[in-house]
């Protein structure tokens, strides 16, 4: 009797241990993909950011933005010191052997025209595709991220072909003891851009994961204040605005054939700001233009989280109950941004939808110096990481 009780207790303990292990594995299965921008090194003073400032256990994947494509259609560096920064980034893997690094090619400055020229021409496309794996391997990267912003209607099939051929090349390039290179793409979350440039069902099957840019939904073109990354539709949203939220974009992508298990929800560490046109300062108030540039980022209409912390001193803070995001006003300035509460709500949503995880744009726009709260580094990214656990 005594022996069977012990056996049962032992079995129960083993099962409990197994359950805990399975839980840990399922929790750790979430990806936290974080972008780093090479131009952040040029910001003044405490705004300057280099890859060695990244905490090696913060993200599961780090994406270096951006690489270039040379005149002979080969993957190439962009900045004068990219090679040195590639080395700094990939050295983080000596401290965290599970960390994966990817190189993103393209971006806003690169433009859609050059991508179109390469993807639409078989000879150019083949040259580019064949150049990628040797380049990534030589610098120690684990994969490529495509940031074609954004394919036009005529490019839709070329974009699919480019992704398909890159995936085939990565499969062909695998050798014993060497993992297949990862392939991801940064996709717009705007309905018009999705409908115009992406065959979602086709590209999703060839990508390891999709970085859905669920931000920049609202801008100065609307001529009124609005949050650029609302989780849900707002009560006052017009017919067009009903598409401009995280919830709609995620569900739409899944409806079009993207597997939830490959979809990463983009969470911004930056805020979008506006200059108010009158004393009215609530959601939907008229604006005269973009907000004032930040002290370090120096870009009208955009503020890093560490600049927002400074703005919040003496500001009036509001929380949008439907959209689940905050905004703040001070004088004639209006800023929609993320905080720890809003990012936790977003992680709760992505878990509910069984998404692959979260993507962060960008590490250098989070409070990496710990200026908001002393010795609290990367507060938004860490809040996302904690909520994913």
UniProtKB/Swiss-Prot annotation:
Which GO terms label this protein's molecular function in UniProt? chitin binding
Q: What induces it?
A: Up-regulated in colon under several inflammatory conditions. Up-regulated upon pulmonary inflammation elicited by sensitization and challenge with the chitin-free aeroallergen ovalbumin or with chitin-containing antigen house dust mite (HDM) extract. Up-regulated in lungs after S.pneumoniae infection. Up-regulated in splenic cells of mammary tumor-bearing animals. Down-regulated by hyperoxia in lung.
Tissue expression pattern: Detected in lung in pulmonary macrophages and alveolar type 2 cells and in bronchoalveolar lavage (BAL) fluids. Expressed in mammary tumor cells (at protein level). Expressed in lung. Not detected in non-inflammatory colon.
Q: Where is the signal peptide?
A: 1-29
Q: List the disulfide bonds.
A: 34-59, 309-372
Question: Main localization of the protein?
Answer: secreted
Its assembly, as annotated, is: Monomer.
In its UniProt entry, what is this protein called? Chitinase-3-like protein 1
Q: Which gene encodes it?
A: Chi3l1
